[in-house]
Amino acid sequence: LRVFPIIFQLLDKIIGFIKLPFGVSFGITQISRNSYWYSWLMLIFIFSISGTLAISSIHRTMEINGIQKVSYETISDVRLIESSPFGIKKEDQEKIMNIGNVDDYSTILRSEGSMGTTGSGNKFEILAIEPEKLPKLAWFRNDFGKESMDQILRKLSENKNEKDLIINQNFEKISITAKAEKKIKNTFLWIVLKGNDGRISTVTLGQINHDKVSDHIGDLSKISLPAKILAVQVYQPGSEDTSKPFQLYLEKIEAIDFENKKVKLISFSRDQFWSPIPSSEGLDTIMETVSTGINLDLGVGSTKGIRGIYRTLYKTGIPAIVDKDFLKNNDKNIKDEFVIYVRGIYVPVIINGEVDYFPSSEENHDELMIFDLQKITNFLELMNLQVIRPNEVVLKVNQNNYDQTLLDIKSNFPLAKMKDKKTLKEKSLVTPLAIVGWKGISSIAFWVLLALVLIGYYGFSIINQEATKSDNVILGVLGVSKIRFLLIIFVEQSLLLSVSMLIGIMSGITFGKILNGIIISLDYRYLSKFPEVLVVGWFELIMIISLILIGFIFYLFVVRNYFKKIILSETMRAEN
């Protein structure tokens, strides 16, 4: 009511500089002169449109959000959360496809990470997924990202071919040719291998020599060959920030067979699949390629006394996708490179993409970082020297014999917490009966609102005719034609209706979101980050706007006859 007069007074001043038809300019002037009077008609229009928007959206919004919220939480039809700290073993995963009516599944590792290297930085949720499998069975809404889930998750991988560095079965020792720039006590050279049995082991090559470039040799008798080389490490006992900085030269890796013959596996100067391991000081290891090998400038930081390089395709960090809250709260951008802290390990990361929302996020934290499951577990296993398994599985289930399928899944995973769409829907307040009830309430409220609006519009029109009778007579006496008079009325009413529709739609959407948010928050589990959608009742909205327009046209017809009548009456009175 306070803003409306100001708007039309400004509009009246603006049109003073523009040459407009008399009916248009006078209509705007009339509203600016009597803005508080016309505000009542405007309030009727705003109330009708906003009220219709709000009440017609309740049952529709409840229904669609109830269904989508369950899908957001389960990702697919069924989601299993393993309670065992050892995760879901490979043999347990193989059992899944033996369960009848299970079409497909995908594994997930959910964990916690923090910014920086102290472990006390800003916390966020880590979701390690299978980029190729998850999009085939997961639910994903169009407004969750600028692209489809499949396109978004492709940013976790790059089309590169990494050649594994393999030690075959006919070797018993391994050698690294290296040299330290100076004498460093209690500093050992290690090589990390993944054996044919899947175990990750460290082979020590002894104290690092500083006198000259020499071979550092380790025994492979306890390694299941063939084995893959994962990393070259330097170990120095001590706390994480007290390691001795020095420069290490690495020339080549050789395998030694049972006849003590050496076979060169790689020359460090020609092999480009190496990157520094982050430490407690971040990315403080600098790697420089020279003509015969590589030089490592090792800083004071370490991971439990370990520094060095690891074999990888991703020299700038493990690709990650983050949500918009992560970017905002941590002041990061796409392609930023930094170190995070996960399970006691410092992990190098590069942000390759972003997503607005992702199913099942916000279970533990508001911020989210998504990894390729294989890539992040490879690095964590390398540093922890133990197998990292997924702790969740999402399953796509055929609807035939659904209940029996759930029982079969539960019997195979007795310790896992199971979330399925059917059970969550049954727990929800958004039942079919509740939807029907709200639909009935909305229908009754709509027709009551419609009746009140039409009565209010009719009442205002009658009162307005009497209130403006003298002004209309003056216009007639001044020679204003019937067409011009109708133009004045048309401008008045159409301006009021246009502004009212705009304000009514905006206020209706706002009020509808608040109302539906209150209803959804009463449900069995409120996910504050789940983006509710407002489903507009277009039929009711179009219907009430159409009836207002019909009433407007009818009002113009009545006013036309009324103006003709009062002019005739005034003419006869003047003649008498």
Model features per residue range: what roles?
Residues 350, 408-452, 464-467, 488:
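Peri-transmembrane interface segments
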Residues 31-32, 476-483, 575-576:
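Short helix-to-coil transition segments within interhelical loops
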Residues 5-155:
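Juxtamembrane segments of multi-pass membrane proteins
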Residues 68-69, 98, 103-104, 108-223, ...:
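Short beta-strand boundary microenvironments
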